[in-house]
Amino acid sequence: MASANTRRVGDGAGGAFQPYLDSLRQELQQRDPTLLSVAVALLAVLLTLVFWKFIWSRKSSQRAVLFVGLCDSGKTLLFVRLLTGQYRDTQTSITDSSAIYKVNNNRGNSLTLIDLPGHESLRFQLLDRFKSSARAVVFVVDSAAFQREVKDVAEFLYQVLIDSMALKNSPSLLIACNKQDIAMAKSAKLIQQQLEKELNTLRVTRSAAPSTLDSSSTAPAQLGKKGKEFEFSQLPLKVEFLECSAKGGRGDTGSADIQDLEKWLAKIA
């Protein structure tokens, strides 16, 4: 399909310049046939460079990394730690915040980090606004409160996955299991397993809902493979899990445990 589209684009461009190309070809043939071969080769190289510049510019325009999650998951403190390296008291936000993040990968790359409110009345509205520009989504989970919030987390994540799969260029997705400094925090492995179970139940419920009542009716009918228990590995987009702690193991004065998150951001930049 891609080669056919390329041929159509090339045919259209060639048609527009055909009289000029014919005239140039005749003049070159009269002077020296070798010049014709050189001119054709140069033209092919030029068109290739223009094509790849267009493709790269589209990719480069997707520089946003969206931080999403339930209220009190710690995503705003993660956002602040990445940008400043410092601890700061945060409160539940009602507006989005964005800032340029310099990626530490020795290539001078940067990303735009966008912290989206976790309040239920705002989260989907703002996600819709920014998702088309997202290179990646960081879904932050409160590992200490996960056991009692698992259903709410799964419902939010379900919609994030559905929205991401519906995009032409699906973003990378990271599940950041935050607050690992708390003794009762669940591991990333356990969180992944429980989310797979909850999402498996959710997709059955959503697929059985009447289309007129299902807000995601224009998206794929279900996640994963039909007839099989849901696993993140079945999705067309890559989903990764890691453990982190925005607060750190020594309280407010300690350094954050976000090295794995920083490495992941450098990888997708």
UniProtKB/Swiss-Prot annotation:
Question: Main location per UniProt?
Answer: endoplasmic reticulum
Q: Which residues cross the membrane?
A: 35-55
- Which Gene Ontology CC terms are recorded? cytoplasmic microtubule; membrane; signal recognition particle receptor complex
Q: Which SUPFAM superfamilies match?
A: P-loop containing nucleoside triphosphate hydrolases
Q: CDD domains given for it?
A: SR_beta (cd04105)
Q: Name one Pfam family in it.
A: SRPRB
PTM Phosphothreonine: at which residues?
Answer: 212
Q: Which UniProt keywords apply?
A: Endoplasmic reticulum, GTP-binding, Membrane, Nucleotide-binding, Phosphoprotein, Receptor, Transmembrane, Transmembrane helix
Keyword Membrane part of the UniProt annotation: yes
GO process annotations (BP): SRP-dependent cotranslational protein targeting to membrane, signal sequence recognition
Write out the residues that bind GTP.
Answer: 69-77, 90-93, 118, 178-181, 246
Q: How does it assemble?
A: Heterodimer with SRPRA.
Similarity-based family: Belongs to the SRP receptor beta subunit family.
Could you tell me what this protein is called?
Signal recognition particle receptor subunit beta
> What organism is listed for this UniProt entry?
Mus musculus (Mouse)
